[in-house]
Amino acid sequence: MTKEDWEAVIGLEVHAQVSSNTKLFSSSSTEFGAEHNTQVSLVDAAMPGTLPILNYYCIEQAIRTGLALSAEINKYSYFDRKNYFYPDLPQGYQITQFFEPIVKNGRVFINDNEKEIRIARIHLEQDAGKSVHEESKTYVDLNRAGVALIEIVSEPDLRSSAEAAECMKKLRQILRYTGSCDGDMEKGSLRCDANVSVRLKGSNTFGTRCEIKNLNSIRHIVQAIDYEIQRQIEILESGEEISQDTLLFDVASGKTKVMRSKEDASDYRYFPEPDLLPVEVSQEKIDLIQSSLPELPDQKKLRYIEELGINEYDANVITSDKAIADYFEELIKKHDSKLAVTWLTVELFGRLNKANIDIVSSPIKANALSELLDFIVDGTISAKLGKQVFDIMFETGKPASLIIEEQDLKQITDKCQISEVIDKIINSNQDKVQEYKSGKTRLYGFFVGEVMKLTKGKASPDVVNSILSERLG
């Protein structure tokens, strides 16, 4: 058998940190980067006698996420205890939703909306703390303990690492659009576990799955899944059996390694959380959240293509990130969509990529670029000079109006002034005038270039072409 005879079966468990200022069951801050153990309440530290108080904002964000994924909202849900011991889990259990999650039966589309990935459930749970390793010692930081997580669990509908990466990107995109999570994988706001198994193509039986924990970048998702697929195929082809293990991905070696034997639900002894009441959500509340949802990426993309005439590639690029889409929306409030696309995707993106920064960190905000386009559209400066102004704006952060004034870049539109320049050039180059009239029409560019040279690029191209065509016959 060859690799082509096998089929991968993959499901994702995506952990998204809720964009909330406080934790799921306490008023402790969730700000990133604080000193160790400075954002820990008595509840987070599991001090005896303390009781959790539910942050209902997190419930609303879970519902927003569910609605954005066309899921069913459970009007009656409750929390459970997942019992296990780990040094950074002070309670000795995690408060999660096992039996009755807040959301179920959703879907997300990948591969240009050609493939549907079913979402089995979305539930809320609290994050654990973090173990900090220094030389021969390990410390526990509880700043993250109790932070609210939305866990999105897909059905095993993915068949390759590329599809898994695409699914993760799409979920991150939707989470950012809804505002439920910032999607920052570098800061740990978004990570996923991948359940991977393989089977012979055509088989309806699932193989033994292994779970790869805590994948925190798209690249690592692809690398880890690809390695695990190949590892399992090699084991099965050698006649051995797959052991149901929980794995970690070693970035340095590019390999998955056994962390522990995979647990079943019974190992965690789930039971309802006795310190929290069930969560009841009215239809009115669901409708209110539904009405507050923004235009989602697929809807926005369709509008850009059908109403604004933008090609599919550019529409994909612009809607790929909410920050980019917001920037574009600001530009098209005043300007033609195609002009906005060019300046955003070619001029701005080119400079951002060169500087290795994203649009959020751009030194040129949307209103500043819009002002520059105003000057180009009304003829104050030419598009060519506009690019020079744009460079200075990018380097200095100065507004276009100030740069145009300081550099004396206002376009010359006075016909008499431009006529004088053209007459001077024609009188000084009679030989080239005769050659042009004899059929060497390529010399037209020479005359335009001379005009621009004498006017330092400030002559209006439209006026120059109008007068020059008349003079040269």
UniProtKB/Swiss-Prot annotation:
GO terms for biological process: glutaminyl-tRNAGln biosynthesis via transamidation; translation. Coiled coil: none annotated. Its EC number is 6.3.5.-. Gene3D superfamilies: 1.10.10.410, GatB domain, N-terminal subdomain. It catalyses: L-glutamyl-tRNA(Gln) + L-glutamine + ATP + H2O = L-glutaminyl-tRNA(Gln) + L-glutamate + ADP + phosphate + H(+); L-aspartyl-tRNA(Asn) + L-glutamine + ATP + H2O = L-asparaginyl-tRNA(Asn) + L-glutamate + ADP + phosphate + 2 H(+). GO terms for molecular function: asparaginyl-tRNA synthase (glutamine-hydrolyzing) activity; ATP binding; glutaminyl-tRNA synthase (glutamine-hydrolyzing) activity. InterPro entries: Asn/Gln-tRNA_amidoTrfase_suB/E (IPR017959), Asn/Gln-tRNA_Trfase_suB/E_cat (IPR006075), Asn/Gln_amidotransferase (IPR018027), Asn/Gln_tRNA_amidoTrase-B-like (IPR003789), GatB (IPR004413), GatB_C_1 (IPR042114), GatB_Yqey_C_2 (IPR023168), Gln-tRNA_amidoTrfase_suB_CS (IPR017958). Belongs to the GatB/GatE family. GatB subfamily. Heterotrimer of A, B and C subunits. Allows the formation of correctly charged Asn-tRNA(Asn) or Gln-tRNA(Gln) through the transamidation of misacylated Asp-tRNA(Asn) or Glu-tRNA(Gln) in organisms which lack either or both of asparaginyl-tRNA or glutaminyl-tRNA synthetases. The reaction takes place in the presence of glutamine and ATP through an activated phospho-Asp-tRNA(Asn) or phospho-Glu-tRNA(Gln). This is Aspartyl/glutamyl-tRNA(Asn/Gln) amidotransferase subunit B. It comes from Wolbachia sp. subsp. Drosophila simulans (strain wRi). The gene is gatB.
